[in-house]
């Protein structure tokens, strides 16, 4: 199981989905496709595929819901970059959506990607049955007001505060970043009809991986460079945002990231099945430069 090959399969599935003739709403789909195809690591769909692959080898069967996960993630990035949110003009090394298409179309493109993803998941559930429906609920919950959007709200209302509690910071990042990561992993296991015990273990794994991912993001915002990251750096500092660096410091965050990643590997080692590809990706996320 090659991670780069999986990324290519996800990329091709997304390109094929948006490579259709449109009429009066063509600019909407152009805007959606722009942000989808501009690049990205495809971590969330790959996590879903690798979680499924622990139990079953026919991972191509779930490329459709994996594609939907990436649409949800991309919609959140389009909205995050808007002037009323993070006001970013660079994403994945390219101008952000609203810089190319304007704010109004960018808002609608984000809305459309979320709705398109839910349509895909519902259609898939109607075809595949109860396991697909359970996976769809996990994903919908993760994207909603008690998930990713809830974390974004806490981020917004805490801008310019001198400090926030660790509990509130954990909530913000585990919802805004971690929830969709965890849902990708859990939904893959559910689609593979894993045992309840394993799903619980993978939920814990997803929680920890999401935390390590966010801490690593905070580290890269300090020590990374815009060329590698494909986006502007030092944004949190410039926007007076609290993060794990402001609470623990850079060196302690580096240690935490390593320790949490080791805990992730331990959880995977306790699961019977082919967890090696997921372990490889977990370590790559720790070592990433972007």
Where on the chain are the PLM-derived regions?
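N-terminal amphipathic/basic leader segments beginning at the initiator methionine
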Residues: 1-18
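Mg2+-dependent prenyl diphosphate-binding active-site environment of isoprenoid biosynthetic enzymes
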Residues: 9, 18, 22-268, 276-286
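Short cytosolic juxtamembrane segments of multi-pass membrane proteins
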Residues: 289-290
């Amino acid at each position: 199981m090659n991670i780069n090959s999986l990324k290519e399969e996800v990329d091709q599935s997304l390109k094929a989905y948006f490579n259709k003739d449109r009429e009066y709403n063509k600019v909407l789909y152009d805007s959606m496709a722009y942000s989808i195809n501009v690049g990205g690591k495809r971590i969330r769909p790959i996590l879903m595929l690798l979680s499924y692959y622990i139990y079953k080898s026919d991972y191509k069967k779930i490329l459709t819901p994996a594609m939907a996960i990436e649409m949800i993630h991309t919609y959140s990035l389009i909205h995050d970059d808007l002037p009323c949110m993070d006001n970013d003009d660079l994403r994945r090394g390219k101008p952000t959506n609203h810089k190319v298409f304007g704010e109004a179309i960018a808002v609608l493109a984000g809305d459309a990607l979320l709705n398109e993803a839910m349509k895909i998941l519902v259609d898939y559930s109607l075809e595949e049955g109860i396991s697909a429906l359970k996976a769809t609920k996990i994903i919908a919950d993760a994207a909603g007001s008690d998930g990713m959007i809830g974390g974004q709200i806490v981020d917004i209302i805490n801008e310019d505060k001198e400090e926030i509690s660790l509990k509130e910071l954990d909530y913000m990042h585990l919802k805004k970043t971690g929830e969709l990561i965890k849902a990708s992993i859990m939904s893959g296991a559910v689609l593979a009809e894993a045992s309840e015990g394993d799903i619980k273990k993978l939920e814990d794994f997803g929680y920890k991986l999401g935390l390590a991912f966010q801490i690593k993001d905070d580290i890269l915002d300090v020590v990374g460079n815009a060329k590698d990251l494909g986006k502007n750096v030092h944004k949190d500092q410039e926007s007076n945002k609290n993060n794990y660096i402001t609470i623990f410091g850079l060196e302690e965050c580096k240690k935490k990231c390593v320790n949490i990643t080791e805990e992730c590997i331990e959880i995977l080692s306790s699961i019977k099945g082919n967890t090696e590809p997921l372990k490889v990706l977990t370590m790559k996320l720790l070592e990433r430069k972007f």
